[in-house]
Amino acid sequence: MSRRKQGNPQHLSQRELITPEADHVEAAILEEDEGLEIEEPSGLGLMVGGPDPDLLTCGQCQMNFPLGDILVFIEHKRKQCGGSLGACYDKALDKDSPPPSSRSELRKVSEPVEIGIQVTPDEDDHLLSPTKGICPKQENIAGPCRPAQLPAVAPIAASSHPHSSVITSPLRALGALPPCLPLPCCSARPVSGDGTQGEGQTEAPFGCQCQLSGKDEPSSYICTTCKQPFNSAWFLLQHAQNTHGFRIYLEPGPASSSLTPRLTIPPPLGPEAVAQSPLMNFLGDSNPFNLLRMTGPILRDHPGFGEGRLPGTPPLFSPPPRHHLDPHRLSAEEMGLVAQHPSAFDRVMRLNPMAIDSPAMDFSRRLRELAGNSSTPPPVSPGRGNPMHRLLNPFQPSPKSPFLSTPPLPPMPPGGTPPPQPPAKSKSCEFCGKTFKFQSNLIVHRRSHTGEKPYKCQLCDHACSQASKLKRHMKTHMHKAGSLAGRSDDGLSAASSPEPGTSELAGEGLKAADGDFRHHESDPSLGHEPEEEDEEEEEEEEELLLENESRPESSFSMDSELSRNRENGGGGVPGVPGAGGGAAKALADEKALVLGKVMENVGLGALPQYGELLADKQKRGAFLKRAAGGGDAGDDDDAGGCGDAGAGGAVNGRGGGFAPGTEPFPGLFPRKPAPLPSPGLNSAAKRIKVEKDLELPPAALIPSENVYSQWLVGYAASRHFMKDPFLGFTDARQSPFATSSEHSSENGSLRFSTPPGDLLDGGLSGRSGTASGGSTPHLGGPGPGRPSSKEGRRSDTCEYCGKVFKNCSNLTVHRRSHTGERPYKCELCNYACAQSSKLTRHMKTHGQIGKEVYRCDICQMPFSVYSTLEKHMKKWHGEHLLTNDVKIEQAERS
């Protein structure tokens, strides 16, 4: 302490508790104070045996004592623990200087608390280490205040006298400390007052505004965070730790011995030395910031500027857990303090620097890695994403995905080497927190968030995020190619030579796409092996027979042969006679009118997309005239009969084609169907409506020209050689859905894949009967002109969900679950279903032969099960249940 301040020492708390037996020692201390020189410690040491063997170093305040003055050292320890800092604070006072407080005001102490504070005289300025604390400037004292360092407090046992004035908690003694302790909860700044000399009023630490009035203890403490008053410093400390989450002291318990503040290596001396915060030892090991070491601005200002350096900190720290935290697993909220509260975070980052013995303990390097996208912290919770990951790892396309990083290190034991890293059992998504067992599944799942679609089709603009989806998409191209293969009348194969540039183009594209897919995912399921022709022919005939037996006759049978003739002609097959130009144009206009009427009668006219397509078709007549080639034979039958236009040029046993422009829309109801008088055909009409509704996507998805050209060829190919009069798609090659469009499972939209020129120029030319003819080139490999495997030959795909079916009838029923269509209706009630078997099962509820029949009294509807009748009454006649007759019947029963 400077000579100017020796006459007016700083105000100290009067809770100085000294036993009477130590009075003679106190006198000896005052006599020896004049010649005692206090040396500035160069570092931290133990309780005994400091850096110099001839010196005694206090383990709490790092004050050195000559070995000959051991009594002074003992009394220094006793007086500090009693709450009086006079022996430590004014060790260099002159003999004539009055003590800071009279002994009559001191109280008796029965158990010591080790607290010390160091003040160095002016003669030892050259030995000073960097500033270790900020002491507020007092009003009535001239000159700056000497910086002092507050020591760490060792935990002590509770007193056996609960009602005595013994301090039983380490931090309760802080009420006796001078107001120079910079803690996060308050700032040490002077408070103006009108006291006499030596009684300057100063704000007390720990977030309290102490009203010092010259007494031994302030009368009230006010928390600067919540403005709650306290009449005791101990209550304020408890409030700060329990309410605001500050780790100030260690609560007594069995684990207290392992959580004592540890001794650290001394800070380096010099102008660039780091200012060590006095708070470092008051925060336990469990504080997350004690495990960090971050470079930041150091307090190198004059101690007098400490008023604005440590502002009052709001409650930004949540109560940390009471166990050792792994610095590698710091949450995003803790790391986010760097950006949100830089000053507070920098202040706390200076707590208790640790010796870096291994690269794993270099936390500053770890933080730089976190900021440099080299590691991904785990998500805060499975239900939400990690905001820190989005801050540090913004998505950007790169050769290596930023998500493919090493997993975080496991928690390390407090005193051991890092354990070997066990294999992670689950992977979690950084966006939604969903966990996966395999990394590959997590990578595919991330693409749903990022929109990345690395797998692209070479035949169209389809792209997907998974190789299996590309494989499924490629099957639709194979179905398109396979659907172009025809079928003869007798169901057997009839070889024909294709036009150059028809199937070869699509075959080459499929080969390239197949090779690209095999590059992405080596899956042998796309390989096609040839099968026996006899087996294929038998299966085709059996399948054809089953379809013919399972489908009812309909009035559209008159169109099947005619449509085949037109589709054959539309393919541009050479040798087909054509009609005259004028007759073809008139016939085209007539067919356009018939098409509009058919769409209105069937119900397609009510849908806006079909109306737009029809209007657009009329505008693009020139394109359709160029697309349709060949002649028209046997097209004079406009009545509703079963007109079989089998005469004309024979292609695969069919009639000839039609002239250009005579078929504006082949395949879509070439002639107006006859009315459906019988109720048995109602279901057939419904089924046709369902399929027609699903054939065309919304017009806004793709260009209308592409819609028309591909829909035209796809639907014509689907109905090319059907023997079943009622849209009998016997396999996937004849389905209008598998040939005209494919479902994109990525965005839920319908896309048309095949370019119009490939199919319109010659896509329908020269196809054989059952596609088993050896002359038809195989698309993507040798063999027949369609996928040779049983699954690929019979499978068909739903356009809505992508589900694959082996039977087209199952696909038709499945589509109704998406569209809500229920064509099968009960004639006795208003029950409707999408499957005939369900209607049959429903009809059993109306009565069976040989069983008792229950009839509804209101509508006379029969039921074979009484519970069904009760349900019917409640659902349809609930308002009639409580009629007078029912009430009378209920009264009789009661």
From Swiss-Prot:
Q: Which protein, by its recorded name, is this?
A: B-cell lymphoma/leukemia 11B
Q: Which gene encodes it?
A: BCL11B
Ranges annotated as biased composition (Gly residues): 568-583
**Which Gene Ontology BP annotations are present?**
alpha-beta T cell differentiation; commitment of neuronal cell to specific neuron type in forebrain; epithelial cell morphogenesis; hematopoietic stem cell migration; keratinocyte development; lymphoid lineage cell migration into thymus; negative regulation of cell population proliferation; negative regulation of thymocyte apoptotic process
Query: What does the subunit section of this Swiss-Prot or TrEMBL entry state?
Result: Interacts with TFCOUP1, SIRT1, ARP1 and EAR2. Interacts with EP300; the interaction is detected in activated T-lymphocytes, but not under resting conditions.
* Ranges annotated as biased composition (Acidic residues): 530-546
Chain intervals with Basic residues compositional bias: 471-480
What ranges does the record list as Polar residues composition bias? Answer: 737-752
- Residue ranges for the region (Disordered) are 370-428, 471-583, 653-680, 737-794
- Protein's UniProt keywords contain Transmembrane: no
Species for this entry: Homo sapiens
Omega-N-methylarginine: modified positions: R293
* Annotated Low complexity bias: 753-775
InterPro entries for the chain: Dev/Hematopoietic_TF, Znf-C2H2_CTCF, Znf_C2H2_sf, Znf_C2H2_type
Chief location bin: nucleus
Q: Name one GO cellular component term.
A: neuron projection
Query: Where in this protein does the record say Asymmetric dimethylarginine is found?
Result: R322
Q: What does its PTM field state?
A: Sumoylated with SUMO1.
Among the Pfam families in the record, one is zf-C2H2_16
| One GO MF term attached to the UniProt entry | zinc ion binding
Please give the residue positions where the record annotates the modification Phosphothreonine.
T120, T260, T376, T406, T417, T754
Q: Which residues carry this modification: Phosphoserine?
A: 97, 110, 129, 256, 277, 358, 381, 398, 401, 483, 488, 496-497, 678, 765, 772
Q: What does this protein do?
A: Key regulator of both differentiation and survival of T-lymphocytes during thymocyte development in mammals. Essential in controlling the responsiveness of hematopoietic stem cells to chemotactic signals by modulating the expression of the receptors CCR7 and CCR9, which direct the movement of progenitor cells from the bone marrow to the thymus. Is a regulator of IL2 promoter and enhances IL2 expression in activated CD4(+) T-lymphocytes. Tumor-suppressor that represses transcription through direct, TFCOUP2-independent binding to a GC-rich response element.
